[in-house]
Swiss-Prot record:
Keywords: DNA recombination, DNA-binding, Viral genome excision
Molecular functions per Gene Ontology: DNA binding
Pfam families per the UniProt record, alphabetical: HTH_17
Protein name, UniProt field: Excisionase
Family the entry assigns: Belongs to the L5likevirus excisionase protein family.
Annotated organism of origin: Mycobacterium phage D29
Keyword flag ATP-binding: no
Job of this protein: Excisionase and integrase are necessary for the excision of prophage from the host genome by site-specific recombination at the att site.
This protein's record includes keyword Ion transport: no
SUPFAM superfamilies linked: Putative DNA-binding domain (SSF46955)
Amino acid sequence: MPQRASIQQTADFLGVSTKTVRRYIADGRLKAVRLGPRLIRVERDSVEALMRPIGK
């Protein structure tokens, strides 16, 4: 996964829908940056943190 991935790439990586990724961004569970009016990129570090088991 690239350092900054598209919403579709992130959804494919996590095995969820793009709607779920957008909800994670809105809830603050994933960090994302807007690079233009329609271009959103998700930070790889936040995806890895989301996948990290609790207590590890």
